[in-house]
Each structure stands twice: as C-alpha cells, then as structure tokens.
Regions:
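Terminal-tail/helix-coil boundary detector
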Residues: 1, 41, 205, 229-262, ...
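N-terminal binding-site loop/beta-alpha segment at the start of enzyme catalytic domains
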Residues: 1-83, 330
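Conserved, mostly hydrophobic/aromatic
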Residues: 6, 18, 40, 55, ...
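Structural preference for beta-strand elements that scaffold enzyme active sites
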Residues: 13-17, 53-54, 82-86, 122-125, ...
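Glycine/proline-rich, positively charged
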Residues: 26-27, 92-194, 198, 205
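Generic structural signal for well-ordered alpha-helices
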Residues: 44, 67, 71, 111-115, ...
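Glycine-rich beta-alpha junction loops
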Residues: 89-91, 162, 188-192, 214-221, ...
Length: 330
C-alpha cells in the first residue's frame, strides 16, 4: 500500500479510502441495498489486511448504523492510532427544527453522537457533507474550529459544494485564525469531470487534497452498458446523476472497456487509475460489496496509464450539468 500526506498536513493516509456507505442496516435509512453488520465486517478486515488505513462514513449513512458497524469492526481489528476515521455532518438526523444543517447547535450535537456511535473519543477527519445556505459560514467554521480545539477531531474537511463556496470557507477560516479545511470530498470520475473547471485548480492552489466519491460512477464504468445491479435499479440519487447524459457516457464506458481489454485488466482498475493520476487526488473513496472490489482497487495503484491512454479516455467527454449534491437548499 502507498501512503500520502493529506493536504498540507502531516497525516499519512492510504491511497485508497474505504467508503463505508454500503455498510450498516438495510432496515435503517434510505438504502435497502446496504450490507448488514455480519456482511460488512469481512470487507473492513480485508481492507486493513491490504494496508488501507483510511475509512470514510457519515452520520446520515443508514441513519447512524454505518458509524456503529465501522466503529465496532475497527475496534476489533485495528489499533485506534493506526487508522484514520473520517465522518461527516449535515444530513437530517431527526425531524423538526435543528435536525440537519451546519448550525453550531447541529455540529456540536452531531460530533458527540458520531463519537458515541463510532466508539471513539475523536475522529481524524470531520467533514461537512454539503454547504448549508441557511447558516452563516462564520458560525459553521467557528463551530468546527471548536470541535478541533476540544480534541474531538484532528482535522476538518468539506464535500460537494461550489468552488466559490469552498473558497469563502477557506477565506473565513484564514481571516479569523480558525482551523482550515484540508480535504475536499468531491464528485469526480470519467463520466463527470466538471470539477476540473474550478474546484481542482482551487485545491491545487490552496494545498487541499481531493478524496473523490463515486470514482467508478456507481459501477457504471466497470460493467457492460446495459447491465444492471440491485443498486443501479433502486438508487434514485444515482439515476439523477447520469440520466441526461447516457449517450455521451456510453462512449466513455466503451473507451474504458477497450483500454482494459488491451491491458488485460478489469475495467475498474482502468477507471480508478485515471482518478489516482489526477492531481491533487490523495485517495479515491471506494465502496466494496464484493471481494474483487478491494482487489481491483489495490491493483489500480500499480496501473500507470500512458498519456495516450488518458487522452483516449478523456476524448469522448462532453460537458455535463453541474450535479453531485450541489444545491442551494438542505
């Protein structure tokens, strides 16, 4: 396993981050396709055996069950000081006022709830899951700074927002002398490259690492175009990401298949290798629900695409509508 520094920090993270949205309780939350605890634990254990030390979850995943499953597995299989646990705040955790968002009340309540579910007294990376247009960014950044100073988080990160919003947050923290974001968990893959326009140049300039979610486009880059899975058939959010660009996306998927065939490797390795070679990507967030998912992710670290292959993969791309959770409302 290869390791890199996260952003401009001294924190070492594996070049693959295990995304834990697929682990939890199928009966809790919005996704019936998630694995239960018994099914999830072998993937977390296998990731550790591969040298993966970076694990990403969120309070909203499986209504908190993901954090519970991840916390118990890591406690059983690893030493706390040897793993990097990342979680997120923003999503609705209870109905009514103050049940979601990035107010001081929500952040200070939810960090304690996440720590309790994870069974730890701190997280390594505490991320805001989305931008909150209903809370002043000064309130959010000060609350996050206080979380760090209280020892409940080592670093903070952000996810899925416009570049101008991220710059505003960075500027606010710098101007006030508060803790600064070190990572951006954004939506980036061969089927969606709009982040190359503003967010990636901003992160390069500011020394912020990318930890992209959905690097395999929810599996679309790994299988035949017409092939369906339980998740692809029931994942309503996923359908909204790709419904309008199907014909253009098909050409990219076919190009991935061609290069994978020429290299004699699975398509997932080609798609992940492309993300891994993007700067300033530290670690793509890879979900694993089958044993070969982790095998392919780790193998992708050794696959170096040529400039010609990268050009061939990128050539069919057409501009997409901005998506990936970027919206004006909670």
């Amino acid at each position: 396993m290869d390791y890199v520094k996260l952003g401009s920090t001294g924190l070492d993270v594996s070049r693959i981050c295990l995304g834990c949205m697929s682990y939890g309780d199928p009966g809790r939350g919005a996704h019936s396709w998630v694995l239960n605890e018994e099914q999830s634990r072998p993937f977390i254990k296998r990731a550790l055996e591969y040298g993966i030390n970076f694990f990403d979850t969120a309070n909203i995943y499986s209504s908190g069950a993901s954090e519970e499953v991840v916390g118990r597995a890591l406690k059983d299989y690893a030493k706390r000081d040897e793993v990097v646990i990342a979680t997120k705040v923003h999503g609705r955790m209870h109905p009514g006022p103050n049940g979601a968002g990035l107010s001081r009340k929500a952040i200070l309540s939810e960090i304690d709830n996440s720590l309790r579910r994870l069974g730890t007294d701190y997280v390594d990376l505490y991320q805001i899951h989305r931008w909150d247009p209903n809370t002043p960014i000064e309130e959010t950044m000060e609350a996050l700074h206080d979380v760090v100073k209280a020892g409940k988080a080592r670093y903070i990160g952000a996810s899925s927002m416009y570049a101008w919003q991220f710059q505003k947050a960075l500027h606010t923290a710098e101007r006030r002398g508060w803790t600064r974001f070190v990572s951006m968990q954004n939506y980036l893959n061969l089927l969606y490259r709009e982040e190359e326009r503003e967010m990636i140049p901003l992160c390069l300039e500011e020394g912020v690492s990318l930890i992209p979610w959905s690097p395999l486009a929810r599996g679309r880059l790994t299988r035949e175009w017409g092939e369906a899975t339980q998740r692809s058939q029931t994942d309503e959010f996923g359908k909204t990401l790709y419904a309008k660009t199907a014909e253009a996306d098909r050409k990219v998927v076919e190009r991935v298949a061609e290069i994978a065939a020429a290299r004699e490797v699975p398509r997932a390795q080609v798609a992940l290798a492309w993300v891994l070679q993007k700067q300033p990507v530290a670690a793509p967030i890879v979900g694993a629900t089958k044993p070969h998912h982790l095998d392919d992710a780790v193998a992708a670290l050794s696959l170096r695409l040529t400039a010609e292959e990268i050009a061939a993969l990128e050539e069919p791309y057409v501009p997409h509508e901005v998506s990936g959770g970027l919206s004006a409302r909670i």
